[in-house]
């Protein structure tokens, strides 16, 4: 758990200007359980700005989003109407709360974040400070820690057909392979820099840039939507900026881990969709076929191994 500040609040001279309108914070919920309460509790220490938290709910059945509305001020439940996927749910919430004539939220930036995040002290303020240092930043992301305290490689290169494909296929079996190391920038110490893409688990997004590229690509139901977003922002002339002075903890997979086989298949579909979309030429077809076949083989191997483990456990 990230420690929260116990000392006195920052003085006025330490504070960045606070806009009159609240900052929109969009989190996509799907039966988030106790994670949501921890998310909202730690959010109080992330910034001195006024906030409006919108839960874009994809069909929760655990009552957690409704309980959060009752317990916390400035938290609203926005029902998407079904399990639309991560990027589509964000798009719907942004359209409803930011892109309307009567919008009451800040029009320059908004936050996209998973509900299983715990915020570090002043983390949102640090993201804003980073955005101020990088005027061309279309997205800004923090340092992300896993529950064991290790740093998650959330700032990465864009995946080329070979580098990204080999990472997806051999990464789970050969952890130290050179393609994964290059893709994840494993050998770089955390430093503020522009990168290929940032984890969508927590992003400060410039609204102008988001509108320019049409938001998240809704062809991605789950996985790779953040890779695609970062790539399209860069192609449109924006930067994806990693700001490790901002820090969060991410308890990954609270909902996606419920059906590993299904989620692996979804990840492979999204991986292939991205790589095929970026490499559409006829002369690249053999590589596309190879990657697709390798992903299918990996899926069969991983799912089969998982089923064998379950049978032995029973």
Regions flagged by a language model, labelled:
Residues 228-310:
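Active-site-adjacent helix/loop segment of glycosyltransferases
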Residues 49, 57-65, 82:
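A conserved acidic beta->alpha catalytic loop
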Residues 159-195:
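Short, flexible, basic/aromatic active-site loop/helix in glycosyltransferases
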Residues 110:
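Short aromatic/hydrophobic "clamp" motif used to bind/position activated sugar donors
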Residues 187-247:
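A short, conserved alpha-helix in the catalytic core of glycosyltransferases
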Residues 41-50:
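Short, acidic, metal-binding catalytic loop of nucleotide-sugar glycosyltransferases
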Residues 80-105:
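Glycine-rich, basic loop-to-helix element that forms the pyrophosphate-binding segment
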Residues 118-153:
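Conserved donor NDP-sugar-binding/catalytic core segment of glycosyltransferases
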């Amino acid at each position: 758990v990230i420690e929260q500040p116990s000392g006195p609040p920052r003085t006025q001279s330490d504070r960045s200007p606070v806009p009159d309108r609240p900052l929109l914070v969009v989190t996509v919920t799907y039966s988030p359980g106790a994670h949501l309460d921890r998310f909202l509790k730690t959010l109080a220490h992330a910034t001195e700005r006024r906030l409006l938290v919108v839960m874009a709910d994809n069909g929760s059945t655990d009552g957690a989003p409704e309980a959060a509305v009752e317990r916390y001020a400035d938290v609203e439940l926005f029902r998407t109407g079904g399990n639309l996927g991560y990027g589509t749910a964000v798009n719907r919430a942004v359209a409803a709360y930011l892109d309307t004539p009567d919008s009451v939220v800040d029009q320059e930036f908004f936050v996209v974040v998973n509900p299983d995040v715990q915020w570090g002290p002043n983390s949102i303020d640090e993201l804003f400070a980073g955005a101020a240092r990088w005027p061309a930043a279309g997205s800004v992301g923090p340092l992300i820690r896993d529950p064991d305290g290790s740093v998650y490689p959330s700032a990465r290169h864009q995946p080329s057909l070979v580098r990204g494909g080999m990472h997806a296929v051999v990464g789970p079996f050969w952890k130290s392979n050179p393609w994964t190391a290059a893709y994840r920038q494993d050998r770089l110490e955390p430093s503020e820099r522009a990168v290929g893409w940032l984890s969508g688990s927590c992003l400060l997004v410039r609204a102008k840039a988001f509108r320019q590229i049409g938001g998240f690509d809704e062809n991605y139901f789950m996985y790779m939507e953040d890779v695609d977003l970062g790539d399209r922002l860069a192609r449109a002339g924006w930067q994806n900026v990693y700001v490790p002075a901002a820090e969060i903890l991410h308890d990954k997979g609270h909902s996606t881990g419920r059906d590993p086989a299904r989620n692996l298949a979804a990840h492979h579909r999204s991986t292939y969709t991205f790589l095929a979309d970026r490499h559409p030429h006829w002369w690249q077809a053999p590589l596309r076929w190879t990657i697709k076949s390798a992903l299918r083989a990996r899926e069969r191997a991983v799912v089969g191994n998982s089923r064998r483990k379950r049978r032995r456990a029973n």
